[in-house]
Design a protein with these regions (language model features):
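Short, charged, low-complexity loops and linkers
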Residues: 1-6, 29-39, 119, 152-160
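Acidic, low-complexity proline/glycine-rich segments
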Residues: 2-27, 167-171
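Active-site-proximal alpha-helical scaffolds that flank and shape metal-associated catalytic sites
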Residues: 11-12, 69-168
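A structural signal for well-ordered alpha-helices, especially hydrophobic packing surfaces
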Residues: 18, 51, 55-58, 82-85, ...
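Amphipathic, well-ordered alpha-helical segments in soluble domains
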Residues: 20-23, 50-57, 135, 139, ...
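Helix-loop segments that flank and shape redox-cofactor active sites
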Residues: 24-41, 52-72
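Conserved small/polar residues in nucleotide/adenosyl-binding loops
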Residues: 175-176
Length: 177
């Protein structure tokens, strides 16, 4: 299976942004294992808002010739994020969370792109989901150790129950780009 030229271009073109993201104060601290439970809880809450928007927009475009082929429900994160949010905030977690201003801008952009030029969602899909299947697994291990989490609780976001072989799944996904 050949990786598409577009997939290679995405990887190349997002490299600088990826490096810049890794060098933000929060991410660089996180990568060193310096993360507070409060900041991690907010990260999980922000992820919830982002992935809820992504999954709602991909559902709207499930019959789209490009997006319908790209998104696989095994990637969906919302249910796992809800489980994590119950762990961190309790059963009425919805009353305790709100997106940060930056997160809300990102969610607005996802919805705007979906409405105006849905094929641009491909870039968001690549950045979020493929990143979760790759570096996200490293972040899971760091969070587990830093926050002293046990038995996977609070880390369900990183679990992809419907994907047995992440590497093979990514390889197939890259051919759809």
């Amino acid at each position: 299976m050949a990786v598409s030229d577009f997939a290679l271009q995405l990887k190349t073109e997002t490299k600088k942004s990826h490096t810049a993201a890794e060098n933000t104060k929060f991410v660089s601290s996180f990568l060193r294992g310096v993360v507070s439970k409060d900041s991690y809880k907010q990260l999980v809450a922000n992820f919830y808002f982002v992935y809820r928007a992504m999954e709602e927009e991909f559902e709207k475009h499930k019959n789209h010739p490009v997006l319908g082929e790209l998104h696989n429900e095994a990637l969906n994160r919302v249910n796992n994020l809800e489980r994590d949010l119950r762990y961190y905030y309790g059963p009425i977690w919805r009353h305790h969370i709100k997106p940060t201003e930056q997160c809300q801008r990102y969610v607005n952009r996802i919805r705007e792109v979906s409405e105006d030029d849905p094929e641009l969602l491909v870039g968001h899909h690549y950045t979020r989901y493929m990143g979760d299947l790759s570096g996200g697994q490293i972040l899971k291990n760091i969070a587990e150790k830093s926050l002293n989490l046990r038995d996977g609780e609070g880390l369900w976001f990183y679990e992809f129950e419907g994907i047995e072989d992440k590497k093979a799944f990514k390889a197939v996904s890259y051919t759809h780009l």
